[in-house]
Regions:
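A short, conserved beta-to-alpha structural element at the edge of catalytic cores
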Residues: 47, 95-108
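A short, conserved alpha-helix in the catalytic core of glycosyltransferases
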Residues: 59-64, 69-101
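A recurrent flexible, glycine/aromatic-enriched loop bordering the glycosyltransferase active site
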Residues: 20-27, 35-58, 62, 77, ...
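Conserved donor NDP-sugar-binding/catalytic core segment of glycosyltransferases
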Residues: 1-28
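Carbohydrate transferase catalytic cores enriched for Leloir-type hexosyltransferases
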Residues: 11-13, 17-20, 51, 131, ...
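Catalytic core of nucleotide-sugar-dependent glycosyltransferases
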Residues: 95, 108-132
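Alpha-helical elements of Rossmann-like donor-binding domains used by nucleotide-donor carbohydrate transfer enzymes
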Residues: 2-3, 77-81, 115, 119-122, ...
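Membrane-proximal basic amphipathic "stem/tether" segments
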Residues: 125-151
Length: 151
């Protein structure tokens, strides 16, 4: 809250996240170290770790809520719409903010991972953002794979 109080023009922020073992939270599985947003990043499969993404309510009022037409990727579409399309003032905070257990709807099955990626590509198209299927998957696979080796 103080970050927003001290920066009245800041509209959103996000940080790093650690996924832990589902049954033993002392065992880190994946370190999602993010970075500052660069325009065009969503087209390369990038997005902030959504549990660390905090937004002023005024942004929701101005640009809308989650689009539930995206069954699995509504969080990614929302961040894409706010950050990439509407260019809100967002800041990456290079700190670990969230530690959570592995799981969730997307990672529940390969089918859901496929559906989520398809929905993200559909969202890119719906927002007229350029995307290249090969570039999207190559960047995404490399960046996600590296997260299992970072501590």
């Amino acid at each position: 809250a103080s970050l927003f109080n001290n920066n009245p023009t800041l509209e959103a922020c996000y940080a790093d996240l650690v996924y832990t073992n589902k049954f033993d939270t002392s065992k880190n599985i994946r370190y999602w170290k993010s970075n500052q947003f660069i325009p065009g990043s969503f087209s390369k499969g990038w997005c902030p770790p959504h549990p660390t993404f905090f937004v002023r309510s005024s942004v929701y009022e101005q640009f809308g809520n989650f689009n539930l037409n995206y069954r699995i990727a509504s969080d990614v579409e929302l961040m894409m719409r706010f950050i990439e399309v509407h260019k809100i003032n967002v800041r990456y905070i290079p700190e670990l903010w969230i530690k959570m257990r592995m799981g969730g709807t997307t990672n529940n099955s390969f089918k859901n991972i496929f559906i989520q990626n398809k929905e993200v590509l559909n969202a890119l198209n719906s927002h007229n953002l350029s995307n290249n299927l090969i570039s999207f998957f190559v960047h995404k696979i490399i960046s996600r794979s590296l997260q299992f080796f970072k501590k």
